[in-house]
């Protein structure tokens, strides 16, 4: 699907999902990778994974600003692939799938990750020339 106007933001999606009674968790990709790494260090990864498995919608935002080492990539893959047939995941990024090689070191893992992300999914191309935030700010006056 392609959406020509950028009217939908993460905040709106979270609000609407919560109002509909869904359990939602929002992370930036970097924060999720950091929380997973911290959970491993604190010996509480299984607790975090169990917590994430109980939510209806996991939103991972900004998957394009920093690269992930092999370990971080593996942990992100584990979380995303575990949810692939069981619960919803929204990933926002300004990169096409072909550009994800810039983010992840392991190309085989990346291929499996993209396969998990795209299986039975809707891919929305929301790249547009205008910005909802900028338009909203300019029209606020």
Report residues per predicted region.
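Residues within alpha-helical segments
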Residues: 11, 15-18, 84
